[in-house]
């Protein structure tokens, strides 16, 4: 049986499972392939609990609020609220009639938490993520609101999601300077098709101790092995959500790296007797910077397949092949700060010692 393990969330004493269950599909509001019945949601949560998952990821906008409602109800049905860590989020606009119902202002953060508590049917949220950088609210305002909510006992920990590296650094420094709760974790898109965060956030979390939770580890299903991508015809073939409702802008399925990674995972999976999706997850879990991986599934069988990735120990040569297949262009300024430039600063004989935190 796949063995879930537990890790501390950042520099806190909170223990979370290395696989988190994303419950965006809990609800009936988002249409085909993005919803399930209440009975299916209840059964899926039972599978997760039975296999040791204690970390559940939702948001106030998932399925227009039903995700939180159904998660809270499913936990109550099993009297399991006390044994789990609930992470939810605020930031996206929830009311088209209210211009202040989106963003990370004090007004919206506090109001969003109050509504989430009612939907979840609980007296506290374990981890509140600011769902995204809203582009306007000063970081001090958002963090002060979160600190007050921690003091009031309505949330336990604060996190960030989908923010630039400079914002995360500012938030961590401001919180520490003001004596406010320091962000416990950042939740970011990370997969073999989206490795941008390695340049900014891997060094950031190593330096600060902030936890790192990966979302989108299978790139909206592209890495499950169920799909093929034709770059010339710009066509995706396969039977599943990707071919029917692929609307996310987070992953461009027609980049050259996509079929290259799909082929690499398929080849390694055939050799190892595993599925491509399991290898894609195992590759992420091999990264010491990653605290937990949030997976979204539509049924218990899919969750069990994902959990089987915990039994996979990829040898160095397989990790290297996936690294090579998924290699993506290095952004500036890291292209400028490469070894040839660093050698001009430190001298070639001192280069290794001078760059202990190179991403």
Report residues per predicted region.
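Active-site beta-loop-alpha junctions enriched in small/polar residues
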Residues: 24-26, 59-61, 89-93, 130-133, ...
């Amino acid at each position: 049986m796949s063995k879930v393990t537990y890790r501390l969330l950042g520099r806190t004493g909170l223990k979370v499972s290395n696989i988190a269950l994303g419950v965006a599909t809990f609800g009936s509001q988002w249409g085909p392939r993005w919803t399930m019945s209440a009975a299916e949601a209840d059964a899926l949560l039972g599978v997760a609990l039975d296999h040791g998952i204690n970390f559940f990821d939702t948001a106030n906008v998932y399925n227009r609020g039903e995700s939180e409602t159904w998660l809270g109800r499913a936990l109550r049905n099993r009297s399991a609220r006390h044994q789990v860590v609930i992470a939810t989020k605020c930031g996206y606009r929830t009311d088209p009639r209210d211009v202040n119902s989106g963003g990370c202002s004090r007004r919206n953060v506090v109001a969003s938490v109050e509504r989430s508590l009612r939907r979840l049917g609980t007296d506290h949220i374990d981890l509140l993520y600011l769902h995204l950088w809203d582009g306007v609210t000063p970081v001090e305002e958002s963090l002060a609101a979160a600190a007050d909510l921690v003091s009031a006992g309505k949330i336990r920990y604060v996190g960030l999601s989908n923010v630039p590296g400079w914002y995360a650094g500012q938030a961590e420094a401001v919180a520490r300077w003001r004596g406010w709760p320091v962000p416990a974790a950042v939740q970011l898109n990370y997969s073999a098709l989206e490795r941008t965060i390695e340049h900014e956030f891997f060094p950031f979390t190593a330096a600060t101790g902030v936890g790192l939770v990966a979302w989108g580890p299978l790139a909206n299903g592209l890495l499950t092995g169920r799909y093929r991508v034709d770059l010339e015809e710009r066509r995706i073939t396969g039977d599943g959500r990707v071919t029917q409702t692929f609307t996310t802008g987070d992953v461009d399925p027609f980049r050259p790296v996509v079929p290259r990674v799909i082929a690499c995972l398929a080849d390694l999976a055939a050799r190892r007797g595993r599925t491509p999706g399991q290898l894609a997850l195992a590759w992420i879990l091999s990264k010491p910077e990653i605290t937990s991986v949030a997976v979204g599934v539509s049924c218990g069988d899919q969750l069990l397949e994902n959990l089987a990735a915990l039994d996979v120990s990829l040898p160095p040569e397989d990790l290297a092949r996936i690294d090579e297949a998924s290699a993506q262009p290095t952004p500036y300024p890291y292209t400028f700060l490469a070894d040839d430039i660093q050698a001009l600063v430190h001298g070639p004989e001192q280069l290794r010692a001078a760059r202990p935190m190179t991403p």
